[in-house]
Amino acid sequence: MKLYVISNSNIMADFILDEFKDVPNVVQINFKQRKNALTSALKWIRLKMGNPRGLFDDTLFEKKFLDEISKIQPEDKVLLWSIENLKNTMLIANEIRSKDIQSFLWNPMLRVRRNNSAEEYKRKIKEYGIGLSTFDPYDSKMLDCRLMPQVHRAVEMPAIEHPEFDVFFVGQLKGREEPMSRLIKEFRDNDISYFFHLINGRHDTGDVAPEIKECIKDELMSYPETLANINKSRCLLDLTQKGQQGLTLRPIEAMMYKKKLITNNSAIKNEPFYNPDNIWILDDPDEKRSVADFMKNVPYTPVPADVEQRYHIRPWLDALWHAPVASAK
């Protein structure tokens, strides 16, 4: 029996699943969606015809992908990782022979929420016999599916005696300007150093405050560089997008690399690793400390190892299947 992980090709999924590069019974397959007017039409036609296996395969899928999934046997386990699009899920599920398919939703299902299509999503997933799980509590209730912890992979980092800056953030603006601007002003007033690498993207930088604009860069930061900057910092900043209750990767990185965390996600109080010594929640009515007090006067408290392990990819996969599918060394 093998475990096949079929994932949307992205930097973070590839980094996490690289944990298994030397594990022969865990195989990663990248799915790159072909998205154009023709493939959209062919998907619609194929699904209307009952989703017959093989129909329009040469147009819908890359040959390499088809070759890789053809090796999957009925007794193998398959995890669809972050393939949230329902049509893609149904097409892939009908192409593989596995009798044990799980789908992990790694993004908030905002489109399903907007379109009020949760019932159709649940019905189709059940029809295809797919086990469904998510990291987001709201989506877990909406889709009546299993709630799993956020998941990551830790790597060894060189010891740094003196951090270069207090607070580190990397990411897109995505409407985060107001809380970010407030924090920057408080950092400056209290001599708290920070390094923010903000991605311009489609955002109009002409409307943002000067303290935000000066942090905007034209190029993405690679994940190895992100890890290096995490290592150089004392605290990570986590600002979730509107509508997301599940954790981003920032809190997990903070825990794994023993950094403090500033976040606007009050749902983090429900996590077993939550400790107010380590985590300061923006705009939380129960938070009586200033961010300066939190940064300067409260020592970090390490998270118990058994708690931290719940968020590591190997035990996480074992927990998903209630079996040791990924624990081989």
Segments the model singles out, each with a brief description of its role:
Residues M1-S98, Q102, W106-P108, K329:
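N-terminal pre-catalytic "stem/leader" segment of glycosyltransferase-like enzymes
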